[in-house]
């Protein structure tokens, strides 16, 4: 067994020189660390986790994912740490969580659990050593973490707060974004570590890997398609600006349209007025998304996959034709022509043929048989083959380096990895032919023509992969060819070993059918077992790490893995000497730099494959430039930032920790009699556990109102013993109205509380309209949201609707509604369920007969209680006279309706109906 491939996993490499400087700075003073992408914020966090893995400490970690927590725990276990971090999830009973906290060490817990435990006192706040915040740039968007830090600082003035992030671009939006983040984190220091930092740059330059940049030239057809897509993209952007003059012109540039964050940028501008936009603008936004996908497919996948996407768009031409016409531009025609030319070509019809003859013989079926398949190979495939050939040649003379070096090929996603595996296993011809057959099954006759030509001399065949010798694909795989097939477990689908194929062209029918069964264009294809008749072994998963034969070659995706550290594990366990970057990804490039620097003396060569002059190259360069500009902006902000001494909240002078009206930015309303409603009783609100995903509980708490988190079946907020609130966002409101769930909720609230309230909360940055534009000029329908809302208020007369533009307005409204009112009881609120029968509000009435009586003509919510107070049961009600009913109901018309309903015979009703007809 070879070194580095044993069952024992390797521990994380020791800190580098500049990383030690980061740790010393952060140990000296709390702060926010902003690193460049890939420079190892996880390594920094891991070091602090290791420092505090001791029962004498109690450190909380926020904003980590389960996969990351598992990775950190495993790494600490490898290093022999005894007191490992623990996870606090909903599987641990609430009454036993206090014991978990008092055992000390590192605690990974969800934000909702921590908020509830802070509010209920289950967590010993005064014993907390500190809090580590991961992905600190999200502290404003995710309100729960900010709430936790505020609760922590209110009860603990000594503990530390250290925050980490590697997303500098996130601070580039909004006004004083980084300052607001630091305010929510209660930190005064900002530590910036860009890639161009002197300490980082000088150290990594001393240990930089050998980089071989290979600028691959796109084929003429690919260049023509790229130009056409860019022309269409530019036309759509101009039209979008024309229809929406208020949009920022700089952000809607063609360069920004190529980057990944463009969809988020355009939604940021259009969301506030999305309901006011016409169909044209909405269609253009969708078109931009499709065009960006086309650009990605062009450079990422093969010619057949790209053509299949285009043809599917053409198949939905009617849908697009109603909204936008980019499919009918000249550039679109050029794109389709060149995309088809990469896959097949139709021979020119001789001009001297008579028109009648051509009409008789040019049926669609006959024309299809005249297609000659071209199946243009991806230029990067050939570059990859050349690289593997070079690596193999070097491995033959690698005795001085300790044997052949392992190879790691990194592509963007699972689909690309599967295509590379199949290409290296079967060759370009077989792979593309199989994919063509799978995608365009109806063109069977055309395939036969191409296959027949292929078996002959084949002068018309123009597949690019034929330009190199047939033995070339197999030469690179001479060592892997003898390996056994791998059957990977489901959780290891992201790891794929490159397998060899037979030397001869797969002309045998059985072999071709075998190849056709291999999935190539779907992500699931990575999990398909590659079978060969000569190899029928089921080896363990260790075979994926090359224990059987050398040199080991692994293909791994850069993105899309369920485990974010899958690639890191492969890198450190396989220890490749050669890394082939099939796709450019900034984070992994930096990760390779750190990997090389942490292994001094061990060679590492990185092959960088990129299309020269392509949108792929432009995207990579734009990402670099945006990160550099973001750091430059942060450096300027740091130089001019004014940070108050009390920012860390270690004394009582920090206003952010104050509760009540003194802490609010809004001016005090003197009409409220100076707040005389505070008569010594602390205000409180009973809140449902599920509501802690929103920002509202945090804002209520900041207003000086205590929160009692419990599990409620009826309502979301209990403000007073009589006032129950059901909170709905606009989308939730519409869904609940359509499903009937809101009716059941209002029924339960009306039954058990005197003042049921429906709170409709909408985001001020996302205005909405319950009815489409021009709806009032049309006939109203019962399916409309407005109609259903009207029916709801008619059915529940005591139900009140509250419209709030933001959680801040809701918190202020709740405070006003609670003035001079008694406080709710959490135990009573928890006891109220949809099936409750004996309750303070309804202990005198049976809910079943009450609902039945309300359905009778003449009985409504106003006279129902009077009727139930004076009549014992339904049998007695049926014996009452009209005069007695008039006295009870207080209205002669209602009394007559009820009396007629109870005493009119069914036959009389039928006869009256016939008379009316």
From Swiss-Prot:
The cofactor required is: Mg(2+)
Give the record's keywords alphabetically: Acetylation, Chromosome, DNA damage, DNA repair, DNA-binding, Endonuclease, Hydrolase, Magnesium, Nuclease, Nucleus, Phosphoprotein, Repeat
Query: Which Gene3D superfamilies does UniProt cross-reference here?
Result: 3.40.50.10130, 5' to 3' exonuclease, C-terminal subdomain
- The EC number(s) given in the record are 3.1.-.-
Subcellular localization is given as: Nucleus; Chromosome
For biological process, the GO terms are: cellular response to UV; DNA repair; double-strand break repair via homologous recombination; double-strand break repair via nonhomologous end joining; negative regulation of protection from non-homologous end joining at telomere; negative regulation of telomere maintenance via telomere lengthening; nucleotide-excision repair; nucleotide-excision repair involved in interstrand cross-link repair
For region Leucine-zipper 1, the annotated ranges are 233-254
What is any one of the record's Gene Ontology cellular component terms? nucleotide-excision repair factor 1 complex
Question: Which residues belong to any copy of the ERCC4 domain?
Answer: 684-764
Task: Region Leucine-zipper 2: list its residue ranges.
Answer: 270-298
Task: Name the InterPro entries for this protein.
Answer: ERCC4_domain, Restrct_endonuc-II-like, RuvA_2-like, XPF, XPF_nuclease
Homology family: Belongs to the XPF family.
Q: Oligomeric state and partners? A: Heterodimer composed of ERCC1 and ERCC4/XPF. Interacts with SLX4/BTBD12; this interaction is direct and links the ERCC1-ERCC4/XPF complex to SLX4, which may coordinate the action of the structure-specific endonuclease during DNA repair.
Q: What is this protein called?
A: DNA repair endonuclease XPF
Q: Which organism is it from?
A: Mus musculus
* UniProt gene name: Ercc4
């Amino acid at each position: 067994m070879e070194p580095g491939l044993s069952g024992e996993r390797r521990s994380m490499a020791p800190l580098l020189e500049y990383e030690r400087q980061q740790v010393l700075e952060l140990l000296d003073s709390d702060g926010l660390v902003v690193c460049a992408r890939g420079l190892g914020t996880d390594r920094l966090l891991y070091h602090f986790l290791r420092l505090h893995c001791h029962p004498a400490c109690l450190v909380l970690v926020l904003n980590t994912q389960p996969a990351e927590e598992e990775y950190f725990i495993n790494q600490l276990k490898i290093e022999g740490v005894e007191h490992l971090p623990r996870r606090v999830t909903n599987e641990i009973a609430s009454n036993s969580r206090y014991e978990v906290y008092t055992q000390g060490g590192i605690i990974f817990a969800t934000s909702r659990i921590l908020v509830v435990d802070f509010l209920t006192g289950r967590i010993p706040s005064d014993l907390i050593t500190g809090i580590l915040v991961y992905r600190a740039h999200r502290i404003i968007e995710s309100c729960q973490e900010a709430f936790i830090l505020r609760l922590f600082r209110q009860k603990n003035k000594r503990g530390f707060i250290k925050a980490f992030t590697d997303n500098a671009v996130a601070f580039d939006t909004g006004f004083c974004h980084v300052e607001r983040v630091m305010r929510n984190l209660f930190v005064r220091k900002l530590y910036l570590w860009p890639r161009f930092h002197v300490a980082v740059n000088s150290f990594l330059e001393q240990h930089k890997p050998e980089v071989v940049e290979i600028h691959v030239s796109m084929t003429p057809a690919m260049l023509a398609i790229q130009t056409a897509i860019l022309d269409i993209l530019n036309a759509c952007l101009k039209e979008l600006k024309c229809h929406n003059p208020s949009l920022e012109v700089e952000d809607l540039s063609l360069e920004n349209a190529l980057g990944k964050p463009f969809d988020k940028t355009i939604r940021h501008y259009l969301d506030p007025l999305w309901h006011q936009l016409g169909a044209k603008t909405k269609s253009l936004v969708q078109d931009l998304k499709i065009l960006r996908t086309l650009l990605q497919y062009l450079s990422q996948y093969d010619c057949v996959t790209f053509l299949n996407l285009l043809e599917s768009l053409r198949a939905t031409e009617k849908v697009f034709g109603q909204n936008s016409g980019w499919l009918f531009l000249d550039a679109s025609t050029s794109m389709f022509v060149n995309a088809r030319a990469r896959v097949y070509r139709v021979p020119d019809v001789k001009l001297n043929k008579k028109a009648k003859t051509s009409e008789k013989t040019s049926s669609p079926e006959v024309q299809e048989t005249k297609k000659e398949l071209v199946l243009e190979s991806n230029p990067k495939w050939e570059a990859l083959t050349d690289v593997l050939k070079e690596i193999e040649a070097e491995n033959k003379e690698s005795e001085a380096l300790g044997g052949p070096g392992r190879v790691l090929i990194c592509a963007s996603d699972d689909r690309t990895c599967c295509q590379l595996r199949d290409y290296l296993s079967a060759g370009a011809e077989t792979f593309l032919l199989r994919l063509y057959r799978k995608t365009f099954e109806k063109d069977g006759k055309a395939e036969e023509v191409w296959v027949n030509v292929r078996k002959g001399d084949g002068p018309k065949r123009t597949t690019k992969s034929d330009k190199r010798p047939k033995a070339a694909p197999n030469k690179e795989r001479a060592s892997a060819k003898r390996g056994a097939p791998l059957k990977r477990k489901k959780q290891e689908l992201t790891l794929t070993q490159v397998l060899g194929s037979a030397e001869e062209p797969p002309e045998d029918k059985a072999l071709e059918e075998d190849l056709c069964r291999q999935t190539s264009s779907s992500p699931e294809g990575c999990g398909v077992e590659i079978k060969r008749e000569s190899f029928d072994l089921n080896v363990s998963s260790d075979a994926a790490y090359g224990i059987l034969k050398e040199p080991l070659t692994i293909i791994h995706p850069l993105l899309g893995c369920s485990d974010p550290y899958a690639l890191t594990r492969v890198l450190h366990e396989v220890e490749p000497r050669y890394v082939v970057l099939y796709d450019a990804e900034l984070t992994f490039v930096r990760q390779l730099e750190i990997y090389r620097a942490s292994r001094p003396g061990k060679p590492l060569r990185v092959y960088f494959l990129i299309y020269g002059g392509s949108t792929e190259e432009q995207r990579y360069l734009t990402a670099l430039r945006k990160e550099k500009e973001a750091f430059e902006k942060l450096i300027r902000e740091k130089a001019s930032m004014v940070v108050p001494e009390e920012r860390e909240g270690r004394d009582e002078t920090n206003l952010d920790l104050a509760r009540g009206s003194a802490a609010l930015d809004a001016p005090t309303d003197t009409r409220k009699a100076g707040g005389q409603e505070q008569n010594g009783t602390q205000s409180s609100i009973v809140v449902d556990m599920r509501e802690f995903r929103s920002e509202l509980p945090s804002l209520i708490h900041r207003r000086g109102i205590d929160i009692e988190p419990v599990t409620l079946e009826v309502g979301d907020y209990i403000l007073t013993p009589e006032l129950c609130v059901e909170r709905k966002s606009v989308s939730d409101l519409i869904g609940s109205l359509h499903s009937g769930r809101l009716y059941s909720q209002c029924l339960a609230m009306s039954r058990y509380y005197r003042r049921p309230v429906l709170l409709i909360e909408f985001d001020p940055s996302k205005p909405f309209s319950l009815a489409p534009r021009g709806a009032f000029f049309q006939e109203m329908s019962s399916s409309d949201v407005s109609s259903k809302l009207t029916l709801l208020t008619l059915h529940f007369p005591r139900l009140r609707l509250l419209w709030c533009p933001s959680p801040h307005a809701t918190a202020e409204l709740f405070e006003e509604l609670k003035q001079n009112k008694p406080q709710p009881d959490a135990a009573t609120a928890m006891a109220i369920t949809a099936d409750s029968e004996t309750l303070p509000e309804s202990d005198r009435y049976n809910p079943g007969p009450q609902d039945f009586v309300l359905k009778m003509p003449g009985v409504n919510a106003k006279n129902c209680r009077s009727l139930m107070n004076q009549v014992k049961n339904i049998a007695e009600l049926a014996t009452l006279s009209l005069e007695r009913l008039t006295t009870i109901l207080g209205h002669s018309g209602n009394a007559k309706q009820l009396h007629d309903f109870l005493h009119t015979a069914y036959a009389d009703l039928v006869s009256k109906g016939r008379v009316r007809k």
